[in-house]
Amino acid sequence: MTTTRDIVTAYYAAFNAGDTGAMLALVADDVRHDVNQGEPRHGKALFAEFNAHMTHCYREQLTDMVIFAEGQRAAAEFIVNGTYLATDEGLPEANGQTYRLPGGAFLSVNDAGLIDRVTTYYNLQDWLRQVGA
Protein backbone atom coordinates (compact mmCIF):
# COMPACT_ATOMS: atom_id res chain seq x y z
CA MET A 1 0.00 0.00 0.00
CA THR A 2 1.31 3.43 -0.95
CA THR A 3 1.21 5.90 1.93
CA THR A 4 0.67 9.64 1.90
CA ARG A 5 4.32 10.03 2.86
CA ASP A 6 5.37 7.88 -0.15
CA ILE A 7 3.26 9.96 -2.54
CA VAL A 8 4.55 13.29 -1.22
CA THR A 9 8.13 12.00 -1.23
CA ALA A 10 7.72 10.94 -4.88
CA TYR A 11 6.22 14.34 -5.74
CA TYR A 12 9.21 16.22 -4.32
CA ALA A 13 11.68 13.78 -5.89
CA ALA A 14 10.04 14.56 -9.25
CA PHE A 15 10.30 18.29 -8.47
CA ASN A 16 14.01 18.01 -7.74
CA ALA A 17 14.53 15.95 -10.91
CA GLY A 18 12.76 18.64 -12.95
CA ASP A 19 10.28 15.98 -14.08
CA THR A 20 7.03 17.91 -14.48
CA GLY A 21 5.39 14.89 -16.11
CA ALA A 22 6.00 12.78 -13.02
CA MET A 23 4.68 15.59 -10.82
CA LEU A 24 1.53 15.84 -12.93
CA ALA A 25 1.03 12.08 -12.72
CA LEU A 26 0.84 12.43 -8.93
CA VAL A 27 -1.80 15.18 -8.82
CA ALA A 28 -5.56 14.86 -9.21
CA ASP A 29 -7.40 16.41 -12.15
CA ASP A 30 -9.11 18.78 -9.69
CA VAL A 31 -5.95 19.70 -7.75
CA ARG A 32 -6.07 22.98 -5.84
CA HIS A 33 -2.78 24.88 -5.83
CA ASP A 34 -2.33 27.76 -3.40
CA VAL A 35 0.77 29.90 -3.02
CA ASN A 36 1.24 32.68 -0.50
CA GLN A 37 1.19 35.28 -3.30
CA GLY A 38 -1.60 35.29 -5.85
CA GLU A 39 -4.86 33.53 -6.50
CA PRO A 40 -5.45 29.79 -6.08
CA ARG A 41 -5.26 27.64 -9.20
CA HIS A 42 -7.81 24.90 -9.72
CA GLY A 43 -7.21 21.92 -11.96
CA LYS A 44 -4.32 20.01 -13.45
CA ALA A 45 -4.12 22.22 -16.57
CA LEU A 46 -3.48 25.40 -14.55
CA PHE A 47 -1.06 23.51 -12.31
CA ALA A 48 0.87 22.37 -15.41
CA GLU A 49 0.86 25.92 -16.78
CA PHE A 50 2.26 27.24 -13.49
CA ASN A 51 4.99 24.60 -13.49
CA ALA A 52 5.98 25.44 -17.08
CA HIS A 53 6.22 29.11 -16.12
CA MET A 54 8.32 28.31 -13.05
CA THR A 55 10.66 26.08 -15.06
CA HIS A 56 11.18 28.93 -17.52
CA CYS A 57 11.92 31.56 -14.86
CA TYR A 58 13.60 29.56 -12.10
CA ARG A 59 15.81 26.55 -11.46
CA GLU A 60 15.21 25.22 -7.95
CA GLN A 61 16.30 22.33 -5.77
CA LEU A 62 14.74 21.58 -2.41
CA THR A 63 17.09 20.40 0.32
CA ASP A 64 16.85 19.61 4.03
CA MET A 65 13.41 18.12 3.28
CA VAL A 66 11.35 16.90 6.21
CA ILE A 67 7.92 15.40 5.50
CA PHE A 68 5.30 14.87 8.18
CA ALA A 69 2.26 12.77 7.26
CA GLU A 70 -0.91 11.85 9.09
CA GLY A 71 -3.73 10.08 7.30
CA GLN A 72 -4.35 11.81 3.98
CA ARG A 73 -2.56 15.03 4.88
CA ALA A 74 1.09 15.96 4.89
CA ALA A 75 3.36 18.89 5.58
CA ALA A 76 6.82 19.44 4.17
CA GLU A 77 9.56 21.77 5.35
CA PHE A 78 12.54 22.48 3.12
CA ILE A 79 15.15 24.93 1.92
CA VAL A 80 14.67 26.32 -1.60
CA ASN A 81 18.01 26.67 -3.40
CA GLY A 82 17.38 28.53 -6.62
CA THR A 83 18.60 30.51 -9.57
CA TYR A 84 16.50 33.28 -11.09
CA LEU A 85 16.79 32.58 -14.84
CA ALA A 86 14.26 34.78 -16.65
CA THR A 87 12.43 37.89 -15.49
CA ASP A 88 9.05 37.07 -14.00
CA GLU A 89 6.36 39.67 -14.66
CA GLY A 90 6.13 42.27 -11.90
CA LEU A 91 9.37 41.13 -10.27
CA PRO A 92 12.95 42.41 -10.50
CA GLU A 93 15.00 41.72 -13.61
CA ALA A 94 16.62 38.29 -13.68
CA ASN A 95 20.34 37.95 -14.33
CA GLY A 96 21.17 34.60 -12.79
CA GLN A 97 20.84 35.64 -9.15
CA THR A 98 20.91 32.80 -6.67
CA TYR A 99 18.78 32.52 -3.56
CA ARG A 100 18.30 30.26 -0.57
CA LEU A 101 15.22 30.49 1.59
CA PRO A 102 13.10 28.34 3.85
CA GLY A 103 9.77 27.12 2.57
CA GLY A 104 6.96 24.88 3.57
CA ALA A 105 3.93 23.19 2.08
CA PHE A 106 0.73 21.50 3.10
CA LEU A 107 -0.67 18.75 0.90
CA SER A 108 -3.60 16.40 0.89
CA VAL A 109 -4.08 13.10 -0.92
CA ASN A 110 -7.47 11.83 -2.11
CA ASP A 111 -8.82 8.28 -1.87
CA ALA A 112 -7.35 7.48 -5.31
CA GLY A 113 -3.85 8.22 -3.99
CA LEU A 114 -3.46 11.50 -5.90
CA ILE A 115 -2.48 14.85 -4.46
CA ASP A 116 -5.54 17.10 -4.52
CA ARG A 117 -4.13 20.12 -2.67
CA VAL A 118 -0.73 21.79 -2.60
CA THR A 119 -0.37 24.94 -0.49
CA THR A 120 3.11 26.45 -0.53
CA TYR A 121 4.59 29.19 1.64
CA TYR A 122 7.86 31.11 1.47
CA ASN A 123 9.00 34.61 2.42
CA LEU A 124 8.68 36.76 -0.71
CA GLN A 125 10.40 39.73 0.96
CA ASP A 126 13.41 37.54 1.77
CA TRP A 127 13.52 36.36 -1.87
CA LEU A 128 13.30 39.96 -3.14
CA ARG A 129 16.16 40.99 -0.86
CA GLN A 130 18.30 38.10 -2.09
CA VAL A 131 17.75 38.87 -5.79
CA GLY A 132 18.54 42.53 -5.24
CA ALA A 133 15.16 44.24 -5.36
Question: Where are the regions that the model predicts?
Answer:
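C-terminal and inter-domain tail/linker signature
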Residues: 1-133
